[in-house]
């Protein structure tokens, strides 16, 4: 699977097609998926930075095991949390969110490996698993975008 920087470059290349919609694939436009990906990346990395490693609670979650083993998030199974549902956006805001994501992704290298974030379905994910989730999630939405554009 591609690293986050390569995935972000692919996302950036889709901005010019943000208004494309194919309801047989998704109720949302290409731009909605791009903005959603960026909200997730930016929000999760921000939460990761603010975490307290002493509060980490590891627990086995079957859903995490399946998604992390297969690298696939099934389509249409989960509803996005309100915090990552795109509000109105335009080309400038997408470009600004790409720039923020690039900076935050660079910050991952210096972060404590014990920093974590809490995922609504997968529980607490330490930095390494958080990065893996971001790659899987981004790839999931890029596949949808590419299907919309077919």
Enumerate the predicted regions with their spans.
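Amphipathic, non-membrane alpha-helical segments in soluble helical-bundle scaffolds
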Residues: 1-5, 27-34, 87-95, 128-131
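Short, helix-capping/interhelical loops that line the mouth of catalytic, cofactor-
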Residues: 2, 46-96
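Charge-rich, low-complexity N-terminal segments
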Residues: 3-30
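A short small-residue
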Residues: 18, 77-85, 117-121
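Short, contiguous alpha-helical
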Residues: 20-69, 113-150
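Substrate/cofactor-recognition hotspot
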Residues: 108
């Amino acid at each position: 699977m591609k690293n986050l920087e390569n995935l972000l470059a692919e996302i950036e290349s889709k901005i010019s097609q943000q208004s494309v919609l194919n309801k047989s694939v998704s109720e949302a436009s290409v731009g909605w998926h791009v903005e959603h990906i960026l909200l997730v990346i930016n929000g999760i990395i921000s939460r990761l930075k603010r975490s307290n490693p002493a509060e980490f609670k590891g627990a086995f979650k079957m859903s995490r095991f399946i998604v992390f083993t297969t690298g696939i998030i099934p389509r249409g199974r989960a509803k996005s949390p309100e915090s990552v549902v795109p509000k109105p956006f335009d080309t400038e805001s997408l470009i600004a969110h790409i720039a923020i994501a690039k900076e935050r992704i660079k910050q991952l290298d210096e972060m404590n490996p014990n920093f974590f974030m809490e995922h609504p379905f997968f529980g607490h994910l330490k930095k390494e698993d958080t990065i893996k989730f971001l790659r899987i999630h981004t790839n999931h939405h890029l596949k949808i975008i590419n299907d919309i554009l077919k």
